[in-house]
Amino acid sequence: ACGSCRKKCKGSGKCINGRCKCY
């Protein structure tokens, strides 16, 4: 699920403890 962080965050995001964090 972490691999889709970039798409969900539109390019800016990190995966922490299995969760997506957008910046």
UniProtKB/Swiss-Prot annotation:
GO biological process terms, semicolon-separated: envenomation resulting in negative regulation of voltage-gated potassium channel activity in another organism
Subcellular compartments: Secreted
Annotated positions for site Aromatic residue of the functional dyad: 23
Domain of life: Eukaryota
Sites annotated Basic residue of the functional dyad: 14
Tissue: Expressed by the venom gland.
Gene Ontology CC terms: extracellular region
Region Interaction with Ca(2+)-activated K(+) channels: start-end pairs: 13-20
Disulfide bonds: 2-15, 5-20, 9-22
GO MF annotations, alphabetized: potassium channel inhibitor activity; toxin activity
Keyword annotations of the record: Disulfide bond, Ion channel impairing toxin, Neurotoxin, Potassium channel impairing toxin, Secreted, Toxin
Domain comment as written in the entry: Has the structural arrangement of an alpha-helix connected to a beta-sheet by disulfide bonds (CSalpha/beta).
Its biological purpose: Blocks reversibly Shaker B potassium channels. Also displaces binding of noxiustoxin to mouse brain synaptosome membranes.
Similarity remark: Belongs to the short scorpion toxin superfamily. Potassium channel inhibitor family. Alpha-KTx 13 subfamily.
Protein name, per record: Potassium channel toxin alpha-KTx 13.1
Annotated source species: Tityus obscurus
